[in-house]
């Protein structure tokens, strides 16, 4: 009560302050919390807050001097390190302040990879004039292609980065064609020229031969030491076109990304194409029709820095006040405009939704933590809409979720984020891929959960065809490993499509492979067989007929639903033997015999037995009492048989956890 009275006195002392200015008032953390959480607050119009020196400098820059660009490359070619040097060069951060400033997730710093495309605004003075540069650091791994594609929507050009010692790799090729198809201006950059093994001339030759790029404007740099990095920004200013937009038109704003903040709620990353947006405006979503009041707008500099306004051509963040009621309201690719301008504004085309192609089941280690796991998953999915989520239940592991991902690394990173950012203790099943069932009546179903796969009789009587997804894999590696790579691809049911040398010693090999083989540690085997020199990229190539079966684990003839997998028939013997051997290691002995089997339908493909505890029923007998001995042994045998028939096998939760661990 005392706190409320003090707040009332404080507010009455400044009756003319608009609520939005309280949000911006220095040191007003309590006021901020009050006005950003209450649903009764409604802003009455754009707020007027004094400009900071930074914002005054930005407001003086016309859209003709905006440059939006990204850095694209194969994984581990130095994108994040180069981003650091550019931020230092423009004075956005202090030299040596932090390594990989734009890699904000713990999992990114641990693995040394970029998972989420991150943005930053910079101001660069070129020939006496300020330029507003907007940089996007994109992921390099194929699993995060959707992040790269979305980043291109807010850019007018890209730095195509190539490692001077490794040359063009698989994802360099993929990222080039993706950027080229969207009409981005590409600037070749050769990185790591300070390495003893660097061959910049060879890398430039590869760029000319593979992409027909003019390498006269290529910049040779070392992001690690900063060598020649200062030559990049003049090239960006002169080569990359300014964004097209008009501040006088009605607001047209694209939602590029979103994430969750425990204090502010859902925060949206937006690209303003036309008009301007400021705190206090009421905007409406074209996708949902829901109206919101803008609570705050700002830029990433590199941290969230509030601004009075975001204008046409800028990329920044906004959050609403009151915030979005549900995280699903933040639809990536949605267009926003001011209320009343809906008919005057044409919504932007948005993004193609990526399809999840790798599925796992996730269960809490402790069933009491199910709600915490659900909240954690929903918060992470807000930041990554390519993940699909469905609730499911298992007799062995209880309530859980069926999660869909773009690839195995995508899945692994999500699992790490659940553990690190939310403290979740989870059990994850091995990854599997969907199967298409074509019924004889012409209907088609996509099966992502093995427990919904038709049984053996239905497959024989009602199913016309089973199909599995295939991908077109592009592999690049030194020619000395050609035999090893071809052997690996053939062993994984691959079909060779093309083979070409893009240099006298470097090979590009294309194979059509089942996606199921790719998620079964294909990349690890490829790296091992080529001593780490091979790189891999892939894209979907459709569905093909296949002999798919359901492999089950049986414990005393009862199926363990959490372990079932859909596999190609040729893999059943190998996988079945692995399953029963591994599961036996984690099952405790009991009073009766436990039979562990791997089965396809009614056919048993592998078996192991856990022997029971032995009780010596003959201990008190006289050695000569043969008939009594036989009678007691027969009685014990019958008792064990009866116990096995009616007794439930008690399998500890940790046994499943150990069995499903990689």
Swiss-Prot record:
The record's subcellular locations are:
Mitochondrion inner membrane
Cellular component annotations (GO), alphabetically ordered: mitochondrial inner membrane; mitochondrial matrix; mitochondrion
Instruction: List the GO molecular function terms.
Output: GTP binding; GTPase activity; mitochondrial ribosome binding
Question: At the top level of its lineage, which domain of life is listed?
Answer: Eukaryota
Where is this protein's transit peptide? 1-42
| Keyword set, alphabetical order | GTP-binding, Hydrolase, Membrane, Mitochondrion, Mitochondrion inner membrane, Nucleotide-binding, Protein biosynthesis, Transit peptide
EC supergroup of this enzyme: hydrolase
Tell me which residues make up the tr-type G domain.
64-244
Q: What's one GO BP annotation on this UniProt entry?
A: positive regulation of translation
Q: Mind telling me which Pfam families this protein's record contains?
A: EFG_C, GTP_EFTU, LepA_C
Query: Main localisation, per the record?
Result: mitochondrion
| UniProt xrefs under InterPro entries | EF-4, EFG_III/V, EFG_V-like, G_TR_CS, LepA_C_sf, LepA_CTD, LepA_IV, P-loop_NTPase
Q: Does the keyword Oxidoreductase apply?
A: no
UniProt-listed CDD domains: EF4_II, LepA, lepA_C
**EC number(s) of the enzyme?**
3.6.5.-
PROSITE patterns given in the database record: G_TR_1 (PS00301), G_TR_2 (PS51722)
Q: Could you tell me what this protein does?
A: Promotes mitochondrial protein synthesis. May act as a fidelity factor of the translation reaction, by catalyzing a one-codon backward translocation of tRNAs on improperly translocated ribosomes. Binds to mitochondrial ribosomes in a GTP-dependent manner.
Family under the similarity heading: Belongs to the TRAFAC class translation factor GTPase superfamily. Classic translation factor GTPase family. LepA subfamily.
Q: What is this protein called?
A: Translation factor guf1, mitochondrial
Q: Which organism is it from?
A: Emericella nidulans (strain FGSC A4 / ATCC 38163 / CBS 112.46 / NRRL 194 / M139)
Gene designation: guf1
